[in-house]
């Protein structure tokens, strides 16, 4: 299973990808066997969704209108599935900001 870190590293890599490939790469599946579903309230799921989006949005521009987060259960496994369509990566802007901050310190 690909970790979130692996996914972000792939997305921020030098290779370019089509929108569909990026969409597939950003489909995060966080699964755990025997999850106590009663503890996953609507408020908790909303908070998780917001936190996931906040972290991913630091690295890529997300199409927030197309974001889909859901819980899927199959057999004895429950998965939190997040489909986060990417508009573009923000690596250039991040590097620019780092350079700008470095210049200010001099």
Curated annotation (Swiss-Prot):
Keywords: Cell cycle, Cell division. GO terms for biological process: cell division; regulation of division septum assembly. Prevents the cell division inhibition by proteins MinC and MinD at internal division sites while permitting inhibition at polar sites. This ensures cell division at the proper site by restricting the formation of a division septum at the midpoint of the long axis of the cell. This is Cell division topological specificity factor. It comes from the Bacteria. The gene is minE. Belongs to the MinE family.
